[in-house]
Design a protein with these regions (language model features):
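Sec-dependent N-terminal signal peptides
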Residues: 1-2
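Solvent-exposed, non-transmembrane regions of membrane-associated and secreted proteins
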Residues: 6-155
Length: 155
């Protein structure tokens, strides 16, 4: 099962991460979710929380921070992705600081809509999960814009 249709090389990079690498956590207050964020979107990452799409921006950085998560299996952090509203706040906690994003858009796309992973000049985060529930027919996508990045204070 693939999330999108990509070349074999791209799929291998995305799905065959050598080991689980935690890079922080994500908190979505409006749906009551806090879950770990891992590098890559392999099964090891998505079974334990959110996965950062390969070669996309790190949270708080310029570009598109693309996040995948399950709706109905494992930790299912995006079970209520369709309840996230425009204006809701999403927090990323990383070793370098806290990124605060505001939701600006939601949409439903086909599985081949790889454009949602493209990089931008803007500071955005794109979350996606299979849609409808218990189906892989479409993807539910939520886009958010960075409001503020607060670096961690050095000790």
């Amino acid at each position: 099962m693939s999330l999108f249709s990509f070349s074999v090389a791209t799929q291998a990079q995305a799905f065959n991460a050598p080991k689980l690498q935690n890079i922080g956590s994500i908190y979505i207050p409006s749906i009551g979710v806090t879950a770990p964020l891992h590098m890559g979107i392999g099964s090891a990452s998505l079974e334990k929380g959110f996965g950062l799409w390969p070669n996309t921006a790190l949270p708080g950085s310029r570009g598109n921070t693309v996040i995948a998560g399950h709706r109905t299996s494992h930790l299912r952090p995006l079970f209520y992705i369709d309840k996230i509203a425009i204006g809701d706040i999403i927090y990323f906690y990383t070793p370098t600081g806290t990124a605060k994003y505001k939701v600006t858009k939601h949409q439903i796309v086909k599985p081949r809509a790889v454009w949602i992973t493209r990089q931008t000049r803007a500071y955005i985060a794109t979350f996606f999960a299979c849609h409808p529930l218990r189906s892989t027919k479409e993807r539910y996508v939520v886009t958010a814009s960075l409001l503020k990045f607060t670096p961690k204070k050095k000790r």
